[in-house]
From Swiss-Prot:
Its cofactor is Mg(2+). It comes from Lacticaseibacillus paracasei (strain ATCC 334 / BCRC 17002 / CCUG 31169 / CIP 107868 / KCTC 3260 / NRRL B-441). Its EC number is 3.1.-.-, 5.6.2.4. InterPro entries: AddA, DNA_helicase_UvrD-like_C, DNA_helicase_UvrD/REP, P-loop_NTPase, PDDEXK-like_dom_sf, PDDEXK_AddAB-type, Restrct_endonuc-II-like, UvrD-like_ATP-bd. Belongs to the helicase family. AddA subfamily. One of its GO terms (molecular function) is ATP hydrolysis activity. This is ATP-dependent helicase/nuclease subunit A. Residues 507-806 form the UvrD-like helicase C-terminal domain. Residues 2-475 form the UvrD-like helicase ATP-binding domain. Heterodimer of AddA and AddB/RexB.
C-alpha cells in the first residue's frame, strides 16, 4: 500500500471548502488526485457520476479514467473480505459507472453543455467542429478580405486607409490583417470579447491620461527606479568604506533626487519626467592617491554598480519620458480616434466571422466555450431554473487537473458550475510548470489563489492551500541544482513567484542508491580570447534560429562524446529502482530536450554520422521531405507554369529527371528571360545533339502530362488530381523504392488526406489549396503524426521541452542553453496584452512614428510575461531528469562564439550583489538560459577557481555538486564504421552467381508498405486466393476504386449518378444525424436539405438517398442501441496501424521482418462498460447476403483489431448493416467473423 506524506494525505482527505494543491515536479499529483477520488468512494460512499473531473488533453483524460477504474478494481479485489456487502455492491457499481463519469477535457465539457442546451441560445445543433488551425485561418482570411473591400468602398474609407497605413508596411496591408486576427484571438480568451474590444480605446482618452499613467505606467517605472535605488545604495555602502569621501558624495548626489521621487505619493508624469531628464551623473573621480589594492577593488565594485544604475536610468527610462505631458496629450488626441477605429473594425470583423461560421455550420473551440458560458448565464425555458444551478446541483465536487494552464474564460466556466459557500473546487497544478502562454493560459489565476489561500485555515469553510514539495523522481543533485538556480533567479518581480523554501523541491526518492551523479554543464567554446574575430562562427544560421550552424554542430559533438562515454564506460551506471541494483546505461535511457525543433535535422545528421541511434519525437519536418517538396512544386507549376523555381525543381526531380547539364542546355537557348521562356525556346529549336534530342523528348513528354494535369485541375477535385499525378508519373512507386520508402509513401498519402479534408471544409481550387499548404508551413503545422516511443527501441530520444512535460527520463541533456529567447512579439506597431493594446502612432503628415506610453507599458508587460514563461520552461526541462542531468550550451557574445574566459567574466559581473537573488536588471536583461544559469553557478563554492568572484555567504553551505566542462574541440568516434574491402588484385570474384541468384523476398516487391483497408480486404479474407507474384495490378499503389475507369453499367445509375456517390452521401447523413433526437422521415429530410443547401451533397445525389432504408435501420436492435446511447457512439473514426506483412499476405511468410501500414475509417462503434460494438454500413445492390458477408468479413476483422489497439475494451459484436435489404448481420454471433 502506498505510504503518503503528511501533505499528500491532507490533499487526499481535506474537503468542505476550496482546495488548491500546489504540486511541485515529481510530487505525485496524479496519484494524489486519483487516491482522493478512491477514498471518497470507499469512505464516503461518494458517487463518481456526481464529480466533475477536468483536465486539458484527451490523453490525460483517458489515462485518468483508466487509473481510477484500475484502482477501484484493485480495491474491490484486495479489500473484498474487509468490506461489507453494501460496500462491495457500492464499489462494484462505481466501477461500472466510471465510463459514465464526467471525466473530460474542458473543451469536451463545454461541448456537452452546448449540445444539451443549444436551444437556449438559438444555436443550430448541426454544427461541425472547426479543429484545423489552417482551415480556421483561411476562413478568417476570406471574411477579412470581404470586409476590407466593403470598408474601402464605404464612407469609412479614409479612416480605414489611415488604420491600414499605421499598422501595415509599404508593400501590403498584411500587418493590419495579422493584428486583426490576433485581436480576435486575444479577445476570445476573455469572458466578454466585445467588452474587451470596445475598451481598447479607453486608455487613450486624453482626459484619462493621468489615471492611465498612475495605474499602468507608474507602477512599472517605480519598480525600475527601485532597482536603480538598490544598486546605488549598494554602491554607496561600498564607497563609504573608502578613505576619500568623493565617491560616496557622488553616489549620494545621484541617489538623493531618486529617493525624494520614490517617497512622493502618486507623482505626476511631469514630476517623474523632471527627475529623469534633468539629472546629470557627474564623471567618476579617477583619484587613486591613498588607495591600497583592496580599496581599489572596492572602488571599482562601487563604480560597476553605479554604471549599471546609470545605464538603466539613461538608456531605458529617460528616453520613455522624452515628451512632456502636454505633447503626450496632443498625441493621444490624434491616436485615440485611430484606436477607436481599430476597435470598431475588429467588432465588425467579429460579427462577420460569426455570421460566416453560422452559414457554414461550424464552431471552433473558442465559440463552444463562449456559447457554453452564455448558456450557463441563462435560465432553462422549460423549468425556469438557472441552468448553472442545475449543474451545481449535479456535482458534489469539481476537480481540476493542471490548473496552472487555465484561461480566464475557462475559469469563468468552472466558477459557474461550482458552489462557493462552502467551496467545492479541488484544483491541482504547479504554476512553475505553466508553459502554455501561446494558448493564452493565465498563470496569474493560480498565483492569486496561491497567495490568498491559507495553509491549514482555522475556518473549516475557508479556502486552503496545500503544498506538495517532495520530489519522488530525481536524485539529490538534480533537485539541489534546480533549487540552486531558481532560488537566485525567480521572484515576483521576474518570474511572477517567489522561489522560497515552500516552493523549493524536497528530496523524497529515498529508494535511490548512494550515488548521486553531479550535474554537468557542457560548454562549447573558442580556444582563447585573442581568437575572437570574424570567422566561420559568424555565418548566419537557420532562418528560424539565431544560432550559427557550426556552433550548434559543436554542441552536438559535445553531447555525442558524452553519450559515447556513458555507453562505453562500465562505471557510468544507473540505479534500477525496481531491481534495487545498478545497471549499465542504454541509449533509450537518454533524452535530449530542445526549446525548438529548428536544429533537429542537424542533430539527426550528426547522430547518424556517429552511429548513435536517435528517435525524434517531434515530427515537424513533413513539408521539408523531398517527396513533399517535389509534389508541392509540381502543384505550383500546374497552377502557374511560369514560376521558375518550382519549374526547375520539378524538371530536376525524378518526375522528369533532367540532369544539371540538361538544365544548363535549356538555359543556353535563351539566357536573359524567365526559365519557362527558355524551355519554350528550347522546344521550338531543332535538337542538334543526342543530349539535346533526349532533353527535347523528356520535356515534350512532361509538358503533355502537365497539360493533362491542368485539365484535371479545372474539371475535377484535388484528390482525383493527386491520384492521377501519382499514377501517371509513377512517383508513388518511385519513392517506395528509396530509403524510408514506406514512410515517404505514407507522406504522399497524407497529402491526399489533407486535400480531402480541405475540400470537405467547403474550400475549392488548386490555387487556394497551395495557399492553404503555404499557411500550414508558416504556422509550423504538420501533416505527419508524432511518432510513438517504442520502449524496446534502444535509441536516444529527441523532443521539445513542451513535449516532455509530464514525462521523466533517467538521463537528460538540455540542449541549446545559449539560444536566444524569442522576443519577436515585443516589436512591431502594436503589442497586445490581456489589459489591452499598446500602439505606435504614425503621423500621416510627417510619417514620423511615436512610441506612445501605452506601447511602452504593453512592451514591458509582454517582456515580463516572456521571461517568466522562459523561466518556467527551464524549470520543466531540469525537473525531467531522474538521475543524470546535463546543461549544454556555448560561450557566446551576441551571435558569435567567444572564449570561455570572456563568458565567465560576464557571469562574474552579473553575479555581483549580496542578496541571494540576482539583481533584477541581470535577470530581466537575460537573453538565454545561460544568462541565468552562469551567474547563479559562478557564485557557488563548486565554481571556485573558474572566476575571481566572491562566494556569496548564502551559498557557502550549499552542497550541490556540479561541474562546468569547457571544450573547444570535442572528439567523436563513430560507433560503427564500414568494413574496408581488402585491396587484393590477385583475388577473382565470380559475380555471375550473384546475378543469377533468386531474390528471396520477391513477393515484397509487389506490395507497398502503405495500404488502405479497401485495397487489402480481399487478401486479408483469404490469402490463398491471391498469387502475389502476378498481382501487380491489385497490390500496387492505386487510387480508390471510384477513380478507375469501369463500365457504365457498373458505375452509374440510370440517372448517371454513381453508386459510390450515393453511398458516400448516405454515409455522411448517418455520420451527421443527431442520435439524441428521435429519427423521423421529417428530421432526415431536414438534414438532407441542409447538406444540399450548404453544397456538401449535390442535389442530384441527395435525391437518390434511400431515407426509408435509414428509418428501417433505426428500427432494428442495433439502431435502437445507437439511439439509446448517443453519447457513447463514435462515428467516422480514422485509424492507422502496423501489421506484420505475413499476416496480411501469406506469400510474405518468409519475410517476417516487414510491416504494412494500414489506414482506414471506421463507420462507427458503441463503447459501454461491457465492451465495444462495431458496425459498418454497406449500400451494395447485391441481394445475396452470404456473398456480401464473405466480401466484407476481412474488412471488419481489421477494424476490430484496430479498435482493440486503440482502447482496452473487448470488441463484443461486429455488425454489417446492409441498408438496401434492411439486413443486420452480427459476424460474431453468426460465426462469420472468423
Amino acid at each position: 500500500m502506498t505510504q503518503f506524506t503528511t501533505s499528500q494525505q491532507a490533499a487526499i482527505t481535506h474537503d468542505g471548502h476550496d482546495v488548491l494543491v500546489s504540486a511541485s515536479a515529481g510530487s505525485g499529483k496524479t496519484t494524489v488526485l486519483v487516491e482522493r477520488i478512491i477514498q471518497k468512494i470507499l469512505k464516503q460512499h461518494a458517487d463518481i457520476t456526481r464529480m466533475l473531473i477536468v483536465t486539458f488533453t484527451r490523453a490525460a483524460t483517458a489515462e485518468m479514467r483508466t487509473k481510477i477504474q484500475t484502482a477501484l478494481k484493485k480495491a474491490l479485489t484486495e479489500r473484498r473480505h474487509e468490506l461489507s456487502g453494501e460496500d462491495r455492491r457500492h464499489l462494484a457499481n462505481q466501477i461500472a459507472m466510471v465510463n459514465a463519469a464526467k471525466i473530460s477535457t474542458l473543451d469536451a465539457f463545454s461541448l456537452q453543455i452546448v449540445q444539451t442546451y443549444y436551444y437556449v441560445i438559438d444555436l443550430d445543433p448541426g454544427f461541425r467542429l472547426l479543429t484545423d488551425e489552417t482551415e480556421r485561418y483561411m476562413l478568417q482570411e476570406r471574411v477579412w478580405d470581404d470586409l476590407r473591400e466593403q470598408l474601402y468602398a464605404s464612407d469609412e474609407a479614409p479612416a480605414f486607409e489611415q488604420l491600414t497605413a499605421n499598422f501595415s508596411g509599404d508593400r501590403d496591408d498584411s500587418g493590419l490583417q495579422d493584428l486583426m486576427f490576433e485581436l480576435i484571438r486575444q479577445a476570445g480568451a476573455t469572458t466578454d470579447p466585445k467588452a474587451y474590444l470596445e475598451g481598447l480605446a479607453t486608455p487613450y482618452a486624453p482626459e484619462k491620461w493621468e489615471a492611465t499613467f498612475s495605474q499602468q505606467i507608474w507602477p512599472r517605472v517605480k519598480g525600475q527606479l527601485l532597482q536603480i535605488a538598490t544598486s546605488l545604495t549598494q554602491a554607496s555602502a561600498l564607497a563609504n568604506q573608502l578613505p576619500n569621501p568623493i565617491w560616496y558624495q557622488q553616489i549620494q548626489a545621484d541617489l538623493a533626487p531618486l529617493q525624494t521621487l520614490l517617497e512622493t505619493n502618486a507623482p505626476t508624469y511631469d514630476t517623474v519626467r523632471s527627475v529623469l531628464i534633468s539629472h546629470e551623473f557627474a564623471a567618476w573621480s579617477r583619484i587613486s592617491k591613498g588607495l591600497d589594492d583592496a580599496d581599489k577593488d572596492t572602488k571599482n565594485a562601487a563604480k560597476d554598480l553605479r554604471d549599471a544604475a546609470k545605464k538603466t536610468w539613461q538608456n531605458k527610462l529617460a528616453p520613455t519620458f522624452a515628451l512632456a505631458a502636454e505633447q503626450i496629450g496632443d498625441l493621444l488626441r490624434e491616436a485615440q480616434p485611430l484606436v477607436a477605429t481599430l476597435a470598431n473594425v475588429a467588432l465588425k470583423f467579429e460579427d462577420a466571422l460569426t455570421a460566416e461560421k453560422a452559414a457554414r455550420h461550424v464552431q471552433d473551440y473558442s465559440d463552444i466555450a463562449h456559447n457554453a458560458l452564455r448558456i450557463l448565464q441563462q435560465k432553462d425555458p422549460q423549468t425556469g431554473a438557472p441552468i448553472a444551478d442545475n449543474y451545481r446541483a449535479s456535482f458534489d465536487e469539481v476537480m481540476v487537473d493542471e490548473y496552472q494552464d487555465i484561461s480566464p474564460l475557462q475559469e469563468a466556466l468552472l466558477a459557474a458550475v461550482s458552489t462557493t459557500t462552502p467551496g467545492d473546487r479541488f484544483m491541482v497544478g504547479d504554476v512553475k510548470q505553466s508553459i502554455y502562454g501561446f494558448r493564452l493560459a493565465d498563470p496569474q489565476l493560480f498565483i492569486h489563489k496561491y497567495q490568498t489561500f491559507q495553509d491549514a485555515p482555522t475556518d473549516p469553510a475557508a479556502p486552503e492551500r496545500i503544498i506538495l514539495a517532495e520530489n519522488f523522481r530525481s536524485t539529490k543533485n538534480v533537485l539541489a541544482f534546480t533549487n540552486l538556480i531558481f532560488s537566485q533567479i525567480m521572484d515576483p518581480e521576474v518570474g511572477d513567484l517567489s522561489y522560497d523554501n515552500a516552493a523549493a523541491l524536497k528530496y523524497g526518492a529515498l529508494d535511490y542508491g548512494d550515488a548521486h551523479p553531479a550535474v554537468k554543464v557542457l560548454l562549447y567554446s573558442k580556444a582563447t580570447s585573442d581568437e575572437d574575430s570574424s570567422d566561420a562562427s559568424e555565418l548566419p544560421g537557420d532562418a528560424d534560429d539565431n544560432e550559427p550552424v557550426d556552433i550548434a554542430t559543436g554542441q552536438t559533438q559535445l553531447v555525442l562524446a558524452e553519450i559515447q562515454r556513458l555507453i562505453n564506460d562500465p562505471d557510468a551506471q544507473l540505479w534500477d529502482r525496481q531491481a534495487q541494483e545498478y545497471r549499465r546505461i542504454h541509449y533509450r535511457d537518454i533524452t535530449l530536450l530542445t526549446r525548438q525543433t529548428s536544429q533537429n535535422s542537424l542533430i539527426q545528421t550528426q547522430f547518424a554520422a556517429a552511429g548513435v541511434p536517435l528517435f525524434v519525437a517531434d515530427t515537424k519536418n513533413f513539408f521539408k521531405t523531398t517527396e513533399l517538396m517535389v509534389m508541392l512544386a509540381l502543384l505550383k507549376v500546374i497552377d502557374n507554369q511560369k514560376q521558375d523555381i518550382p519549374l526547375v525543381a520539378v524538371l530536376r526531380s525524378p518526375i522528369v529527371g533532367l540532369s544539371a547539364d540538361q538544365l544548363a542546355l535549356i538555359r543556353l537557348a535563351a539566357k536573359q528571360v524567365p526559365y519557362y521562356d527558355a524551355v519554350t525556346a528550347f522546344l521550338q529549336a531543332e535538337p542538334k545533339t543526342p543530349l539535346a534530342q533526349r532533353t527535347h523528348d523528356m520535356l515534350t513528354h512532361f509538358f503533355n502530362q502537365l497539360s493533362h494535369f491542368r485539365d484535371l485541375a479545372r474539371e475535377n477535385d484535388l484528390v482525383t488530381l493527386l491520384w492521377a499525378i501519382y499514377q501517371d508519373t509513377g512517383f508513388l512507386d518511385y519513392v517506395g523504392g528509396t530509403p524510408g520508402g514506406s514512410q515517404r509513401q505514407a507522406n504522399l498519402q497524407a497529402l491526399i488526406d489533407r486535400a480531402r479534408t480541405y475540400e470537405a471544409g467547403g474550400f475549392k481550387g488548386l490555387f487556394a489549396f497551395i495557399h492553404f499548404i503555404t499557411l500550414m508551413q508558416k504556422q509550423d503545422q504538420d501533416l505527419a503524426m508524432p511518432a510513438q516511443v517504442d520502449p524496446d527501441n534502444d535509441a536516444v530520444k529527441l523532443m521539445t521541452i513542451h513535449k516532455s512535460k509530464g514525462l521523466e527520463f533517467p538521463v537528460v541533456f538540455l540542449m541549446q542553453a545559449n539560444k536566444h529567447f524569442n522576443m519577436s512579439d515585443q516589436t512591431g506597431t502594436a503589442i497586445l496584452t490581456k489589459q489591452g493594446i499598446g500602439i505606435k502612432w504614425l503621423d500621416p503628415e510627417t510619417r514620423v512614428e511615436y512610441e506612445l506610453p501605452q506601447y511602452q507599458a504593453a512592451k514591458a508587460a509582454r517582456q515580463n510575461q516572456t521571461l517568466a514563461e522562459e523561466m518556467r520552461l527551464l524549470y520543466v526541462a531540469l525537473t525531467r531528469a531522474q538521475q543524470r542531468l546535463y546543461v549544454v550550451g556555448a560561450t557566446m557574445s551576441g551571435n558569435q562564439l567567444t572564449s570561455a574566459d570572456k563568458t565567465v567574466e560576464k557571469w562574474a559581473a552579473a553575479a555581483e550583489g549580496e542578496a541571494r537573488v540576482l539583481a533584477p536588471q541581470v535577470r530581466s536583461g537575460a537573453t538565454s538560459y545561460l544568462d541565468w544559469i552562469g551567474p547563479a553557478l559562478i557564485r557557488h563554492p563548486q565554481a571556485r577557481g573558474l572566476a575571481e568572484t566572491t562566494i556569496k555567504p548564502a551559498l557557502v553551505g550549499d552542497e550541490t555538486e556540479f561541474t562546468i566542462e569547457i571544450d573547444v574541440n570535442p572528439q567523436v568516434t563513430p560507433t560503427a564504421t564500414p568494413e574496408k574491402v581488402s585491396d587484393d588484385s590477385g583475388t577473382m570474384v565470380d559475380l555471375s552467381a550473384w546475378f543469377k541468384k533468386a531474390y528471396p523476398f520477391q513477393a515484397a516487391t509487389t506490395t507497398t508498405g502503405f495500404q488502405s483497408v479497401s485495397e487489402i480486404k480481399r487478401a486479408f479474407d483469404d490469402p490463398d486466393t491471391i498469387d502475389l507474384v502476378n498481382a501487380d495490378r491489385f497490390l500496387g499503389p492505386k487510387p480508390p476504386m471510384r477513380d478507375l475507369t469501369a463500365p457504365a453499367f457498373l458505375t452509374e445509375t440510370p440517372s448517371g449518378i454513381s453508386p459510390a456517390a450515393i453511398g458516400t452521401a448516405t454515409h455522411l447523413l448517418l455520420q451527421l444525424v443527431d442520435l439524441a433526437k428521435p429519427i423521423t422521415m421529417a428530421s432526415l429530410r431536414a438534414l438532407r436539405d441542409q447538406l444540399t443547401t450548404t453544397q456538401v451533397i449535390a442535389v442530384d445525389v441527395a435525391k437518390h438517398i434511400d431515407l426509408t432504408a435509414l428509418i428501417r435501420f433505426f428500427e432494428t436492435d442495433l439502431g435502437r442501441l445507437l439511439l439509446a446511447k448517443p453519447q457513447q457512439v463514435h462515428r467516422e473514426v480514422p485509424f492507422s496501424m502496423l501489421l506484420p506483412a505475413d499476416q496480411v499476405f501469406e506469400a510474405l511468410a518468409d519475410d517476417p521482418g516487414e510491416d504494412v501500414l494500414i489506414h482506414g475509417i471506421i463507420d462507427g462503434y458503441v463503447s459501454d462498460e461491457q465492451g465495444v460494438t462495431l458496425f459498418d454500413y454497406k449500400t451494395d445492390h447485391n441481394p445475396n447476403t452470404a456473398v456480401l458477408v464473405d466480401r466484407y468479413r476481412g474488412q471488419l476483422n481489421l477494424y476490430a483489431q484496430a479498435l482493440q489497439d486503440l482502447q482496452p475494451k473487448p470488441v463484443l459484436h461486429r455488425y454489417l448493416v446492409f441498408l438496401r435489404t434492411g439486413t443486420v448481420v452480427d459476424l460474431v454471433a453468426s460465426g462469420a467473423g472468423k
